[in-house]
Amino acid sequence: MRLITEMYSHQIKAVEKLKRIKIGAAYMEMGTGKTRVALELINIRLQKDRIDHVIWLCPCSVKENLKRDIIKHTGEEQECITICGIETLSSSIKANSYLLDLVKNKRCYLIVDESNLVKNHKAKRSQNIIRLAEYCTYKLILNGTPVTKNEADLFTQWYILDWRVLGYKSYWSFAANHLEYDDKGKIRRCLNVDYLVEKIGPYSYQVKKEECLDLPPKTYEKVYYELTNEQYEHYLNVADELMFSLNEFNPWTIYRMLIALQDVISGMLVNTSKDNIQTSPYFDNPLDNPRIKTLMELLDGLEEKTIIFCKYQSEIDDITNIINSKYGKDTAVPFTGDLTQKKRQNNLDLFQTTSQYLVANKQCGAYGLNLQFCSYIIFYSNDWNYGTRSQAEDRVHRIGQTENVHIVDICAADTLDERILKCLDKKENLVDSIREEIEKNKDKEDKLYSWITKKDWRKRKYSLKIKNKDKEDLYENL
């Protein structure tokens, strides 16, 4: 293997530390070039005849991008590197058998890219990767940070490398020493964290962007709009129906309410009369949706290439169709998991050349893409996952970015949208926040209600009471 790109100083430091050990972790924030570090380590092992093949596991959505990155750094495809999607190992017998045969018959270097995807010790993908790792002497995990939620994330990732680093052969022994649970089975806090830091320190290299890159800043803007009167009334009705069925012991009731309210905000008519929420378009013409109107006003006169992140497939379809109808075919191209890998790559190529807008969902577009030629992001709709939000932002805020990155959030005033953005700003989990509110305000209807709307619950309840009375009863009250 011949590497044709130069390394930055922070990448050289990473290689200098990790080349001396057989297993290791490169915790390098998105955009700092961890792929280049991994390729340098591979090259060193190959030259010293310690390995003869590489199994590189990564999210399925970034396989093609990883191939192109490897070609960018080496000048050609590398037959000694087998790339496989992490998610594939959850279900594909063929892929698992093929990789198992490889590790049994070759000296394989196992690389787990975006290793936070294997933090669940019970998951099939994690168990299958652990089985592969048993046959590999050289192993490397790549991720932005050691922990995305809490220190429990560390166990499986480091068990894949070598259980002896942390010193626990099972998750239960790890949990007994480091995790404290509440009476609902939820991790309350992590214990003896200093021990874990001390154990992984000799095998880890960690760097943040601000420590190593002179990148231009990110600027943020929130653009507010209001639901139509009828739409907001529907929002409040759905809140009325679902608010007091909430149960902090049953996360399903919380997710059900969040999903239903976000559906309404998105522009859907929501029926909550059955267990499964049923939706249909609220507006006959998508252009009547005030959220889409707000987006189109933002795009009017915008010349920069722009990524538009959406939560729902229906939003992506509507936005792509509306933009292309107004500005011409392929002005906007979609990027979702529903498309084939070939079609996704074709749309990325169009976005890099002639198309102005990439309309994507975060689950597909947040991982592994290098889009630093773009400097404008619009979050048309958000979910409550800070991890994928951060990943999405850093698709453009990375090595090679020379422009200020401007990020816009579209927000429906006085709705759950505002709460979601507050939780993202604070890096909080929305479901956990709601659980806390339920626990604190069990007997305070108005407090709990104000969590998802700024309307006064007491006035709302009185107006509903009046609304539901017939005229004779109303006259009696008056």
Q: Which ranges hold each PLM region?
A:
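Interdomain linker/hinge connecting the two RecA-like lobes of the SF2 helicase core
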Residues: 22-25, 29, 115, 122, ...
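Conserved two-lobed SF2 helicase motor
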Residues: 79-93, 350-367
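Conserved Walker A/P-loop ATP-binding site and its immediately adjacent core
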Residues: 35-40, 50-70, 148-153, 311-313
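Conserved P-loop NTPase motor "coupling/switch" region that bridges the ATPase
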Residues: 52-53, 72, 109, 126-211, ...
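Conserved pre-motif I regulatory segment
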Residues: 1-27
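SF2 helicase/translocase ATPase core recognition
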Residues: 137-171, 212-239, 360-443
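Conserved helix-turn-beta segment of the N-terminal RecA-like "Helicase ATP-binding" lobe
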Residues: 61-81, 161-164, 326
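Conserved helicase ATPase core of P-loop NTP-dependent helicases/translocases
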Residues: 307-309, 317-320, 324-365
